[in-house]
C-alpha cells in the first residue's frame, strides 16, 4: 500500500519516523519493486528505523527470484544507518501483536535483542 501511495495525496512523510512494513501473499519480485520504489522516492533517506513484520506466504515465480524477502529488504536499505528489525511479531500470520501507530517510539536493535519503547 505504501509504495502505491507515492506521489499521491495519501503519500507518507518518513523523515525522523520508524517505518513498519509487512505483507501477505506477495510475490518476491513485487516486494523488490516496492522496496526500490520507496527508495527512489527517498522514503528511506531520513528514517529513524525500519521494522519488518511478518512477510507471510510470500510467493516465487516459476523462474526463482533468487532472494528471500529479508534479503531484498536488506539490499534496499543497506546504504542507510538506521536500525532494522526483522521478524517483528506483527503480521497476517499466527503472531499478530498490536503496534500503536503514530506513537513516538525509540527502536534499538542489537545482537539477538530488539527494544521498541515509547
Regions found by a protein language model. Give the residues of each.
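C-terminal active-site/capping subdomain that shapes the small-molecule cofactor and substrate pocket
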Residues: 33-118
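ATP/pyrophosphate-binding catalytic subdomain of soluble kinases
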Residues: 1-35
